[in-house]
Amino acid sequence: MISWGLSCLSVLGAAGTTLLCAGLLLGLAQQLWTLRWTLSRDWASTLPLPKGSMGWPFFGETLHWLVQGSRFHSSRRERYGTVFKTHLLGRPVIRVSGAENVRTILLGEHRLVRSQWPQSAHILLGSHTLLGAVGEPHRQRRKVLARVFSRSSLEQFVPRLQGALRREVRSWCAAQRPVAVYQAAKALTFRMAARILLGLQLDEARCTELAHTFEQLVENLFSLPLDVPFSGLRKGIRARDQLYEHLDEAVAEKLQEKQTAEPGDALLLIINSARELGHEPSVQELKELAVELLFAAFFTTASASTSLILLLLQHPAAITKIQQELSAQGLGRACTCTPRASGSPPDCGCEPDLSLAMLGRLRYVDCVVKEVLRLLPPVSGGYRTALRTFELDGYQIPKGWSVMYSIRDTHETAAVYRSPPEGFDPERFGVESGDARGSGGRFHYIPFGGGARSCLGQELAQAVLQLLAVELVRTARWELATPAFPVMQTVPIVHPVDGLLLFFHPLPTSGAGDGLPF
């Protein structure tokens, strides 16, 4: 018994020694990791590095970020201030928030900073995208893509988008079970982007399959840059290659077409614009640009659409005000005819519905959309790389370090609004409101970024949200299918953790046309 007890003590002692040594080694490794990045500062500058933690060797604070979500950034902002350092996704990062700090970053494009997304995003999206371009290539690609979102193109998109949204809302009302809104919104935005924006000919089964594949790609866009079996990057590459296989034929056909591109056909507009600038785009370039356009529309628009539906449900007074505005504009009653299979409005003889000009007159609807994007911006921020060492808020930003400006933190801490920033108040964007105006005011509200890299498709995105608000309010009422409102996850895209389960019910209507009533 004594020898057995001594053996147990010996084992426990050895285990304790091992754990102590392991702890000391881990602590030493962390200190050396921190020292490594401290020594990477620009010694020509007398300014200190921002406060913060670099986490653990190689992983940095990536795991904390993924687990804690928005709390990761808010807790560090409270501890270190509006400029702090961390280490995410394999790179040292300086996180920046606050209108003046963000203004410096956004207006410093090509001078202080250049666009920098995580390495995994560059690998998955390719080298021919607007996202990855810098300098003159960026300006040229932006000029080409600008035609896709021109006024004439948007005019062509609006009636087709409205038809698709009307069909979707009616399908939700017809469902005899709860609708998972976030999943439905992702499927809807992919269909609209693929069929309406890119003009791809997809049946429902193929569209559903590609939407799932695309979701796999985007879900692994922000992953560790390790191309090994079962890694997120490997899954993303496999999904991307499957998308490219489908796009090969569609892109090749577009390249062979000789007619002038009409507004509303994104791929043909891109091809013709590039040719006018003396460049013949390759199949690979067009595939990458097509995937980038899908990426720009997919999760972000689905996220904002879900947030719109959730916030309207939580604030019924806003629904009442929208209904009053629609009635005042003669738009209070929706056409009850069945839209065409393509998503375009029905050929029913009803009075023409919404246009860009009509949307422009819906001031309160516009305020609601802006407030949704302020309170729950789909994307938390944007990445840049410092081209040279510069000062920001009393700290040095060393050349070569990544900078991430925070949209969400900037919105949450903006002190320019009359009403509290954490509340839902569309009136803050009203005509009579002076909120967010004055010196630097536009950088208190940045859901679409700003400067040379502001979102080209912001008018299209806002039009989609306005159309969705109109179709919802005059077609349906909705209620929770769960006991309580869901928790919102904010990394990497804002969305409800349970997908937002809702029941939709059609509003009473009178026949408005020759087609079948809903």
From Swiss-Prot:
Parts of the chain that traverse the membrane: 293-313
Cofactor: heme
Observed phenotype of the null mutant: The knockout presents no discernible embryological defects, however double homozygous mutants for Cyp26a1/c1 display a more severe RA embryopathy phenotype than either mutant alone, with lethality by E11.0. Among others, this includes CNS patterning abnormalities, a reduced size of the head, eye, frontonasal region and an open neural tube between the fore and hindbrain.
Residues that hold heme according to the record: C455
UniProt key word Metal-binding: yes
Cited InterPro entries: Cyt_P450, Cyt_P450_CS, Cyt_P450_E_grp-I, Cyt_P450_sf
Compartments in which it is found: Membrane
Keyword terms, alphabetized: Heme, Iron, Lipid metabolism, Membrane, Metal-binding, Monooxygenase, Oxidoreductase, Transmembrane, Transmembrane helix
Catalysed reaction equations from the record: an organic molecule + reduced [NADPH--hemoprotein reductase] + O2 = an alcohol + oxidized [NADPH--hemoprotein reductase] + H2O + H(+); all-trans-retinoate + reduced [NADPH--hemoprotein reductase] + O2 = all-trans-4-hydroxyretinoate + oxidized [NADPH--hemoprotein reductase] + H2O + H(+); all-trans-4-hydroxyretinoate + reduced [NADPH--hemoprotein reductase] + O2 = all-trans-4-oxoretinoate + oxidized [NADPH--hemoprotein reductase] + 2 H2O + H(+); 9-cis-retinoate + reduced [NADPH--hemoprotein reductase] + O2 = 9-cis-4-hydroxyretinoate + oxidized [NADPH--hemoprotein reductase] + H2O + H(+)
Top-rank taxon, per record: Eukaryota
GO BP of this protein: anterior/posterior pattern specification; central nervous system development; neural crest cell development; organelle fusion; retinoic acid catabolic process
Topology versus the membrane: Single-pass membrane protein
Keyword Protein biosynthesis: no
Molecular function via GO: heme binding; iron ion binding; retinoic acid 4-hydroxylase activity; retinoic acid binding
Family matches, as Pfam families: p450
Cellular component GO terms, alphabetical: membrane
EC number: 1.14.14.1
Task performed by this protein: A cytochrome P450 monooxygenase involved in the metabolism of retinoates (RAs), the active metabolites of vitamin A, and critical signaling molecules in animals. RAs exist as at least four different isomers: all-trans-RA (atRA), 9-cis-RA, 13-cis-RA, and 9,13-dicis-RA, where atRA is considered to be the biologically active isomer, although 9-cis-RA and 13-cis-RA also have activity.
UniProt record similarity statement: Belongs to the cytochrome P450 family.
Record-given protein name: Cytochrome P450 26C1
Phylogenetic placement of the source organism: Eukaryota, Metazoa, Chordata, Craniata, Vertebrata
This protein's encoding gene: Cyp26c1
